[in-house]
Amino acid sequence: MSEPIRVLVTGAAGQIAYSLLYSIGNGSVFGKDQPIILVLLDITPMMGVLDGVLMELQDCALPLLKDVIATDKEEIAFKDLDVAILVGSMPRRDGMERKDLLKANVKIFKCQGAALDKYAKKSVKVIVVGNPANTNCLTASKSAPSIPKENFSCLTRLDHNRAKAQIALKLGVTSDDVKNVIIWGNHSSTQYPDVNHAKVKLQGKEVGVYEALKDDSWLKGEFITTVQQRGAAVIKARKLSSAMSAAKAICDHVRDIWFGTPEGEFVSMGIISDGNSYGIPDDLLYSFPVTIKDKTWKVVEGLPINDFSREKMDLTAKELAEEKETAFEFLASA
């Protein structure tokens, strides 16, 4: 057995965490021979609920779970971390402007970034889930100057999985048969789900998605809006935001960081845009197609970008630049 790793989940009394914690504890994310010390952080009013979650994790009697720590104190939560999954954020309330949401979250992620900087291992991998995820991730990274910015990523894997699922449903195959879809940009309704480079396995051979579907107007229209608005559709139907699918996407994202991506396959994640070859401005936290090896991501280079894609990629970059500007004004005054 290897040494236990310390894994933090914030917002640990919430819906997403409730769907996520069992998968982390049972070896689905870090492997079946990796012991784990699981650290659960939430705000003080949630500590009663968190106690219940702690009891349930104990009652799961998971052999890999060496310890579970529930706390509302950052100096305990962020100590010596190997992995931080930042799920907790201020949710958007009715009538709340996106700007107000940004302001509340800048405060949270500035504090958590500073706590990572002060207490966590410098090799910590930080995954931001709480919305607005891209800008929250950038805020945390800026507030943790001693941790390499490449160690920070935000979740667009849920959008990626949603795109795969839509293509699979349309073609009557399983999601497994679809690969190399891309989510460009922000985890918001401006994201651009791109299947120009995606492949699908049909009758044992790989075909381009455009060629397989022969329905360009669906791919350039309804498909894109369905993926962009899927989160809102789930809320409308379930009266709660996506939790099971979000937790599954977090597992996929973190597992790929840990073990790498399969040969010939790429995935989507929000990462720092510095030095990219797709004309996206530097210093944005933008979702790109990446491959991962030895816990290090690399942007997939050289994919041809048509005019339709270019426009969509620039639009979501513009939104991210505006969010960043607003967040940094708050950051300066926070």
UniProtKB/Swiss-Prot annotation:
Q: Which NCBIfam families match?
A: MalateDH-SF1 (TIGR01759), MDH_euk_cyt (TIGR01758), PRK05442.1 (NF003916)
Which top-level enzyme class is recorded in the Swiss-Prot or TrEMBL entry? oxidoreductase
Q: Which gene encodes it?
A: MDH1
Which Gene Ontology molecular function entries are recorded, alphabetically? hydroxyphenylpyruvate reductase activity; L-malate dehydrogenase (NAD+) activity
Per the record, residues carrying N6-succinyllysine are K110, K214, K298, K318
Coiled-coil ranges per UniProt: none
The free-text function statement in the UniProt record for this protein reads: Catalyzes the reduction of aromatic alpha-keto acids in the presence of NADH. Plays essential roles in the malate-aspartate shuttle and the tricarboxylic acid cycle, important in mitochondrial NADH supply for oxidative phosphorylation. Catalyzes the reduction of 2-oxoglutarate to 2-hydroxyglutarate, leading to elevated reactive oxygen species (ROS).
Organism per entry = Bos taurus (Bovine)
Q: Which Pfam families match?
A: Ldh_1_C, Ldh_1_N
Output the PTM entry.
Answer: ISGylated.
Protein name per UniProt: Malate dehydrogenase, cytoplasmic
In the record, biological process GO terms are: malate metabolic process; malate-aspartate shuttle; NADH metabolic process; NADP metabolic process; oxaloacetate metabolic process; tricarboxylic acid cycle
Binding residues for substrate? R92, R98, N131, R162
So what does this thing catalyse?
(S)-malate + NAD(+) = oxaloacetate + NADH + H(+); (2R)-2-hydroxy-3-(4-hydroxyphenyl)propanoate + NAD(+) = 3-(4-hydroxyphenyl)pyruvate + NADH + H(+); (S)-2-hydroxyglutarate + NAD(+) = 2-oxoglutarate + NADH + H(+)
